[in-house]
Amino acid sequence: MVKNQAQKKGVKRKQVKNIPSGIVHVKATFNNTIVTITDPAGNVISWASAGKVGYSGSRKSSAFAATVAAQDAAKAAMSSGLKEVEVGLKGTGAGRESAVRALISSGLIVSVIRDETPVPHNGCRPRKRRRV
């Protein structure tokens, strides 16, 4: 009986938060595209990637997979009341522009598009050139 009371006490319902504005972080690498939607404080509301949406292997790096991932993340975020977003792009993958287009077409109002790609000031040695 003591265990039942402890279990009932610890269970809380997840409250649906109404967040009008947020930030979309799009990380477009050569192998995958990850879309994370946060509130202005940085707490994650929803996320999606090309792998999570169902693509695997070389299809994850396609622009269409990035579009589907962005639509999936936007739909989940709009269910919690999100309307207006700022977009931060990171990386040089194939899904950069297509992810932003998908966010706009899904009904989110995009106020700012920022390029946050990290550029080294001659940091690590780059990987060797690919010879095909």
From Swiss-Prot:
Molecular function GO labels: rRNA binding; structural constituent of ribosome
GO cellular component: ribonucleoprotein complex; ribosome
Xref: Pfam families: Ribosomal_S11 (PF00411)
GO biological process, one term: translation
Listed PROSITE patterns: RIBOSOMAL_S11
Residues passing through the membrane, by range: none
Cell division as UniProt keyword: no
Family per record: Belongs to the universal ribosomal protein uS11 family.
Function as written in the Swiss-Prot or TrEMBL entry: Located on the platform of the 30S subunit, it bridges several disparate RNA helices of the 16S rRNA. Forms part of the Shine-Dalgarno cleft in the 70S ribosome.
Subunit structure: Part of the 30S ribosomal subunit. Interacts with proteins S7 and S18. Binds to IF-3.
Protein name: Small ribosomal subunit protein uS11
Species name: Chlamydia trachomatis serovar A (strain ATCC VR-571B / DSM 19440 / HAR-13)
Gene: rpsK
